[in-house]
Amino acid sequence: MVMVTQKIYIELKAFDSYLLDRSARSIILTAKRSGARVNGPIFFPRRVAKFIVNRSTHVDKKSREQFEIRTHKRLISLPKANSTIIQALMSLQLPAGVDVKVKVIGGSNNG
Protein backbone atom coordinates (compact mmCIF):
# COMPACT_ATOMS: atom_id res chain seq x y z
CA MET A 1 0.00 0.00 0.00
CA VAL A 2 1.39 3.39 -1.00
CA MET A 3 0.82 6.19 1.50
CA VAL A 4 0.91 9.70 0.04
CA THR A 5 1.89 12.42 2.50
CA GLN A 6 1.34 16.09 1.89
CA LYS A 7 2.24 19.29 3.66
CA ILE A 8 -0.84 21.32 4.57
CA TYR A 9 -1.04 24.96 5.61
CA ILE A 10 -4.33 26.12 7.15
CA GLU A 11 -4.75 29.90 7.34
CA LEU A 12 -7.52 31.23 9.58
CA LYS A 13 -8.85 34.81 9.53
CA ALA A 14 -11.54 36.39 11.68
CA PHE A 15 -12.62 39.67 13.23
CA ASP A 16 -13.21 38.00 16.61
CA SER A 17 -10.03 36.63 18.22
CA TYR A 18 -11.95 34.37 20.63
CA LEU A 19 -13.74 32.61 17.75
CA LEU A 20 -10.46 32.31 15.88
CA ASP A 21 -8.61 30.74 18.81
CA ARG A 22 -11.46 28.31 19.45
CA SER A 23 -11.45 27.24 15.79
CA ALA A 24 -7.66 26.83 15.76
CA ARG A 25 -7.84 24.72 18.92
CA SER A 26 -10.50 22.43 17.42
CA ILE A 27 -8.46 21.98 14.21
CA ILE A 28 -5.34 21.13 16.22
CA LEU A 29 -7.18 18.65 18.46
CA THR A 30 -8.76 16.93 15.44
CA ALA A 31 -5.41 16.66 13.67
CA LYS A 32 -3.65 15.30 16.77
CA ARG A 33 -6.43 12.74 17.33
CA SER A 34 -5.84 11.54 13.76
CA GLY A 35 -2.14 11.11 14.47
CA ALA A 36 -0.71 14.18 12.75
CA ARG A 37 2.22 16.30 13.83
CA VAL A 38 1.03 19.89 14.18
CA ASN A 39 3.02 23.14 14.10
CA GLY A 40 1.13 26.11 15.43
CA PRO A 41 -1.00 28.04 15.82
CA ILE A 42 1.38 30.68 14.51
CA PHE A 43 0.11 34.16 15.35
CA PHE A 44 0.29 36.83 12.66
CA PRO A 45 0.20 40.56 13.44
CA ARG A 46 -3.27 42.00 13.85
CA ARG A 47 -4.31 44.27 10.98
CA VAL A 48 -6.24 47.38 11.93
CA ALA A 49 -8.07 49.32 9.23
CA LYS A 50 -9.28 52.72 10.46
CA PHE A 51 -11.99 54.80 8.84
CA ILE A 52 -12.66 58.43 9.79
CA VAL A 53 -16.02 59.87 8.74
CA ASN A 54 -17.54 63.33 9.15
CA ARG A 55 -20.57 63.21 11.44
CA SER A 56 -22.20 66.10 9.66
CA THR A 57 -23.19 65.91 6.03
CA HIS A 58 -22.22 69.47 5.13
CA VAL A 59 -20.28 71.53 7.69
CA ASP A 60 -18.56 71.12 11.06
CA LYS A 61 -15.30 69.51 9.99
CA LYS A 62 -14.14 69.14 13.62
CA SER A 63 -16.89 66.68 14.45
CA ARG A 64 -15.75 63.29 13.18
CA GLU A 65 -16.36 59.66 14.02
CA GLN A 66 -13.74 56.89 13.96
CA PHE A 67 -14.35 53.26 13.06
CA GLU A 68 -11.89 50.39 12.90
CA ILE A 69 -11.86 46.81 11.73
CA ARG A 70 -9.39 44.45 13.42
CA THR A 71 -8.46 41.34 11.46
CA HIS A 72 -6.78 38.50 13.37
CA LYS A 73 -4.83 35.74 11.59
CA ARG A 74 -3.45 32.32 12.57
CA LEU A 75 -1.52 29.69 10.63
CA ILE A 76 -1.51 25.96 11.36
CA SER A 77 1.00 23.72 9.61
CA LEU A 78 0.66 19.96 9.19
CA PRO A 79 4.05 18.77 7.84
CA LYS A 80 3.07 15.15 7.11
CA ALA A 81 -0.65 14.78 6.50
CA ASN A 82 -2.19 11.68 4.95
CA SER A 83 -5.70 10.93 3.69
CA THR A 84 -7.14 10.01 7.12
CA ILE A 85 -6.09 13.38 8.55
CA ILE A 86 -7.55 15.21 5.56
CA GLN A 87 -10.87 13.34 5.93
CA ALA A 88 -11.01 14.22 9.65
CA LEU A 89 -10.41 17.89 8.88
CA MET A 90 -13.04 17.91 6.12
CA SER A 91 -15.72 16.69 8.53
CA LEU A 92 -14.93 19.44 11.06
CA GLN A 93 -17.61 22.11 11.63
CA LEU A 94 -16.23 25.64 12.13
CA PRO A 95 -18.12 28.83 13.11
CA ALA A 96 -19.44 31.16 10.41
CA GLY A 97 -17.18 34.11 11.31
CA VAL A 98 -13.94 32.30 10.50
CA ASP A 99 -12.43 32.38 7.01
CA VAL A 100 -10.38 29.26 6.23
CA LYS A 101 -7.81 28.91 3.44
CA VAL A 102 -6.13 25.55 2.92
CA LYS A 103 -2.92 25.20 0.92
CA VAL A 104 -1.74 21.68 0.06
CA ILE A 105 1.87 21.19 -1.03
CA GLY A 106 3.50 18.10 -2.45
CA GLY A 107 2.58 14.49 -2.64
CA SER A 108 5.66 12.38 -1.97
CA ASN A 109 5.29 8.60 -1.87
CA ASN A 110 6.47 6.84 1.29
CA GLY A 111 6.32 3.12 1.41
Curated annotation (Swiss-Prot):
Belongs to the universal ribosomal protein uS10 family. The gene is rpsJ. GO terms for molecular function: structural constituent of ribosome; tRNA binding. Pfam families: Ribosomal_S10. Involved in the binding of tRNA to the ribosomes. One of its GO terms (biological process) is translation. Keywords: Ribonucleoprotein, Ribosomal protein. It comes from Ehrlichia ruminantium (strain Welgevonden). InterPro entries: Ribosomal_uS10 (IPR001848), Ribosomal_uS10_dom (IPR027486), Ribosomal_uS10_dom_sf (IPR036838). It comes from the Bacteria. GO terms for cellular component: ribonucleoprotein complex; ribosome. Part of the 30S ribosomal subunit. This is Small ribosomal subunit protein uS10.
